Amino acid sequence: MTAIAPVITVDGPSGAGKGTLCKALAESLNWRLLDSGAIYRVLALAALHHQVDISTEEALVPLAAHLDVRFVSQNGQLQVILEGEDVSNEIRTETVGNTASQAAAFPRVREALLRRQRAFREAPGLIADGRDMGTIVFPDAPVKIFLDASSQERAHRRMLQLQERGFNVNFERLLAEIQERDNRDRNRSVAPLVPAADALVLDSTSMSIEQVIEQALAYAQRILALPLKK
């Protein structure tokens, strides 16, 4: 009987450092990587490329079920590959974002993408980045991590990111947006943002990213006893 590939899930709110942690874990363990937050954007871009009617659930479901996407982490950078093409920047456009929101409203599309996400589970293992990876998508994952940070710290990190890109941003506005999203995500009726009962909860508010990676790796190694990538 073939053993099921192990999964490390990393859930948490926006700005907690999930993406950076997941890329580091994937490179250290040489495992596959799933960025669930990008899945809907990739589907939206595929629909635009193939001129699929995004207002029709029936047209989107088969595209979602057979979405040709993979995620590659190299030197700390995440590449999103759609049908063999790097679309890492293209999926971040406003047009794709709006299209993704429309696609996410269809229950059958969500179900198809849930199955597609689970199909990423292949040997030697998978790092799954999201908000409900440990509670909904991979509830049997042997290693679950919930990465959190105060809303103030997450707003500060986001402000620095935007300033580095040349944007003039208001901290109080960023903080209000993050708190509003937190409230919506944590209190929604379907797949609320909560730690799995068996998850390791890491508060990164006063931690460096190096400390977060070190603790997460140590925890995963203790449970899985797997060698690090040379």
Curated annotation (Swiss-Prot):
Enzyme Commission no: 2.7.4.25
Enzyme category, top tier: transferase
Annotated keywords: ATP-binding, Cytoplasm, Kinase, Nucleotide-binding, Transferase
MF annotations from Gene Ontology: ATP binding; CMP kinase activity; dCMP kinase activity
Gene3D superfamilies registered for this protein in UniProt: P-loop containing nucleotide triphosphate hydrolases
CDD domains xref list: CMPK (cd02020)
Cellular compartments annotated: Cytoplasm
Matches recorded under Pfam families: Cytidylate_kin
Positions of ATP binding: 12-20
Assigned protein family: Belongs to the cytidylate kinase family. Type 1 subfamily.
Protein name in the entry: Cytidylate kinase
Taxonomic path: Bacteria, Pseudomonadati, Pseudomonadota, Gammaproteobacteria, Enterobacterales
Gene: cmk
